[in-house]
């Protein structure tokens, strides 16, 4: 992460330097000028007059050099002072004046630049080697001007003038620099922080812009829009949390007997509820991703970050792993069969859930990042996210697809044999729920790869922002990172995870039947003295009558209930005969 930030960001800066240097081709016929006190090189040069090329402006020259020197804050303490020396000697070359007499006794003045000595360039070559080799080869110590003259002569430069007469001048190279130790200090422009002052040895999750400058925390990728995303996320997650609580009550607390289908729905809802809980914990604290150390994002050593990371991973994997079981139950029901060895499935699923939650913790991978909350960090390119989340998600997606296709085939055959719109409506509703599962998993697992594919674009946006803050007022610089729409859609997709199961099973008439038949609910009503107001017996009878044709929705995994469904189908077929 550190090196990728460094290389991608410095490309823009050093392309800027290349453009500046290339524009400074050797042009003769210029003038000798005093070095302006506003020049950033005023205190670094041991002479007062410099050679100004024809057509150049002192004001513009000062601005260009100032911008470049500010960009050198993003190098290293070893490279910066030597690079500044080269820039100053090259941008403000010492002016040598020669007064010659022509054959007609006319005096002519030659103003010539004294170019930086090769020895000065060599002092910068080693500490700035990574930058020179990758980005500014034209500025190597062996570079030449377009007319063939060495840019950094070893001893001197020969100038020849034939138009005004046969004049040859040998001008010694210039090494009149005032060495200043203060120039080796890196001053990171706000809001960046100096790594030397803020990075704590032994602690991680710092985001380097260069070897010397790190991002401050918090850092908004989408300035001005983060609060909108947070509010949307909180609202959708709250709705999902409420529906999950309702599903837990309906299929886990109130039933007199919990069937296999109920347990699958209950487990999925518990996962959605736990996932929402991790968001609620983080939303209670402003800038939750930031540690108490300036510039450091929270890592696993911050126990609250570890806790929320574990909770989110456990909840998400729970919902993901139990969604294929819901699809499998739907398939088995469509075959009028029964799930066998459900207890074994239960043990295997929960074992994998606990292992995949704990495994990243043993690897120390739970931490916050610039773009995400506390979860599994893959900034170092490791495979922890793949092993613990994405590969299991892909397996779940494959199983959901398989069982959905098989279920559609079976339901179609069933409807052709015994047309029943109410049963068909229920089956279509479950299929829509499974499609929502697939959409959520597909989008959540593919967004990572889209973001990684666009990573260079993100780095370029950050590079432009850093270049802006390096040149002027940080308040005038705004980061324009791409992908806001996809980020917002991802929040919506993750936020409705728990709500999807409610669409398929929470709106079914069997829910009323479960509540009205529940002995626990009856006990609560009796304790609250509401049993005389709410007539359960009549409600139960009405519910039974309304659900007579859809009795298959209650379990599909019990032999007795399968028999009821078959009887109802036969009864429906008889009633529909003329």
From Swiss-Prot:
* Gene Ontology CC terms: membrane
User: Which keywords does the record carry?
Assistant: Disulfide bond, Glycoprotein, Membrane, Receptor, Signal, Transmembrane, Transmembrane helix
Q: Where is this region: Disordered?
A: 544-578
**Got any disulfides in this one, which pairs?**
32-95, 41-88, 79-128, 121-141
Instruction: Specify the domain of life of the species encoding this protein.
Output: Eukaryota
Q: What is its main location?
A: membrane
Subcellular compartments: Membrane
User: Which residues are sugar-modified?
Assistant: 46, 64, 99, 104, 144, 155, 181, 233, 289
Q: Which residues lie on this side of the membrane: Cytoplasmic?
A: 255-261, 327-341, 410-422, 512-578
Q: So where does this one cross the membrane? A: 234-254, 262-282, 306-326, 342-362, 389-409, 423-443, 491-511
Domain FZ as annotated: residue spans? 27-157
Q: List the stretches on the Extracellular face of the membrane.
A: 24-233, 283-305, 363-388, 444-490
Q: Which residues form the signal peptide?
A: 1-23
What are the Polar residues biased-composition ranges?
563-578
Bilayer topology annotation: Multi-pass membrane protein
**Record InterPro entries:** Frizzled_dom, Frizzled_dom_sf, GPCR_Fz/Smo-like
- Low complexity biased stretches: 544-556
- Zinc-finger as a keyword of this entry, yes or no, is no
**Family per similarity comment:** Belongs to the G-protein coupled receptor Fz/Smo family.
Please state what the protein is called. Answer: Frizzled and smoothened-like protein Q
Organism name: Dictyostelium discoideum
């Amino acid at each position: 992460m550190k090196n990728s930030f460094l290389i991608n960001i410095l490309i823009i800066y050093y392309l800027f330097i290349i453009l500046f240097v290339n524009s400074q081709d050797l042009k003769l016929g210029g003038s000798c000028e005093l070095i302006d006190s506003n020049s950033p090189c005023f205190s670094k040069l041991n002479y007062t007059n410099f050679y100004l090329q024809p057509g150049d402006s002192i004001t513009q020259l000062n601005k260009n050099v100032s911008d470049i020197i500010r960009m050198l804050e993003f190098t290293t303490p070893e490279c910066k002072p030597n690079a500044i020396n080269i820039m100053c000697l090259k941008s403000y070359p010492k002016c040598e004046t020669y007064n010659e007499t022509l054959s007609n006794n006319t005096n002519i003045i030659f103003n010539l630049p004294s170019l930086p000595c090769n020895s000065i360039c060599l002092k910068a070559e080693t500490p700035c080697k990574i930058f020179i080799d990758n980005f500014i080869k034209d500025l190597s110590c062996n570079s030449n001007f377009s007319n063939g003259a060495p840019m950094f002569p070893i001893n001197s430069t020969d100038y020849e003038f034939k138009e005004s007469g046969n004049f040859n001048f040998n001008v010694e190279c210039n090494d009149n620099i005032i060495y200043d130790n203060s120039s080796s200090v890196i001053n990171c422009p706000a809001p960046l922080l100096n790594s030397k002052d803020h990075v704590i040895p032994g602690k991680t999750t710092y985001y380097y812009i260069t070897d010397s400058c790190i991002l401050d925390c918090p850092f908004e990728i989408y300035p001005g829009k983060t609060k909108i995303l947070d509010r949307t996320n909180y609202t959708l997650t709250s709705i999902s949390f409420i529906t999950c609580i309702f599903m837990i009550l309906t299929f886990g607390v109130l039933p007199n007997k919990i069937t296999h289908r109920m347990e699958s729905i209950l487990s999925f809802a518990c996962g959605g509820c736990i996932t929402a809980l991790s968001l609620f914990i983080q939303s209670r604290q402003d800038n939750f991703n930031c540690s108490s150390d300036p510039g450091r994002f929270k890592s696993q050593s911050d126990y609250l970050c570890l806790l929320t990371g574990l909770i989110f991973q456990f909840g998400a994997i729970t919902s993901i792993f139990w969604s294929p079981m819901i699809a499998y139950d739907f398939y088995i029901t469509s075959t009028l069969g029964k799930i066998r060895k459900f207890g074994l499935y239960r043990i295997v699923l929960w074992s994998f859930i606990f292992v995949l939650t704990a495994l990243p913790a043993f690897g120390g991978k739970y931490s916050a990042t610039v773009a995400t909350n506390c979860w599994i960090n893959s900034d170092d390119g490791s495979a922890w996210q793949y092993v613990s989340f994405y590969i299991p998600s892909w397996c779940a997606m494959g199983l959901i697809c398989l069982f959905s296709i098989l279920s559609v085939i079976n339901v179609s055959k069933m409807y052709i044999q015994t047309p029943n719109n109410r049963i068909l409506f229920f089956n279509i509703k479950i299929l829509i729920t499974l499609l929502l599962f697939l959409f959520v998993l597909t989008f959540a697992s593919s967004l990572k790869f889209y973001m990684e594919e666009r990573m260079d674009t993100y780095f370029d946006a950050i590079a432009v922002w850093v270049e802006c803050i390096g040149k002027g007022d940080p308040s005038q610089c705004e980061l324009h990172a791409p992908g806001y729409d996809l980020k917002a859609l991802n929040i919506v997709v993750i936020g409705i995870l728990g709500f999807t199961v409610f669409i398929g099973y929470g709106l079914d008439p069997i829910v009323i039947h479960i509540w009205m038949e529940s002995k626990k609910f009856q006990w609560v009503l009796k304790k609250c003295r509401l049993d005389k107001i709410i007539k359960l017996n009549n409600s139960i009878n009405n519910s039974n009558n309304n659900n007579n044709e859809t009795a298959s929705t209650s379990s599909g995994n019990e032999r007795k209930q399968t028999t009821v469904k078959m009887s109802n189908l036969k009864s429906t077929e008889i009633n529909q005969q003329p």
